[in-house]
């Protein structure tokens, strides 16, 4: 991927651009400001690759038959996402209890699978 002939597209700011700046030294990097149309850059042949979160790769590959994941099931780095809530102990406890219950029931895995395996 990191060759002078590769055209890489990335959304501005955040962890995707940070990863690209830190690790990609030779590819042609173009920042694309619109997160809704960035995937079209690859589909229409204006970019060769995009580095993004694994969950987004799975979702977009499922929604666009012209896209596919490289190294499915593997990632370039480790990153966990979290929930940020307003400071409210009762709400926090409710959300934590709900997530714990849903995770234990297998509901979260079911939702991810349903949306990723369309």
Please tell me what each predicted stretch does.
Residues 1-118:
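Proline/Glycine/Serine-rich low-complexity intrinsically disordered segments
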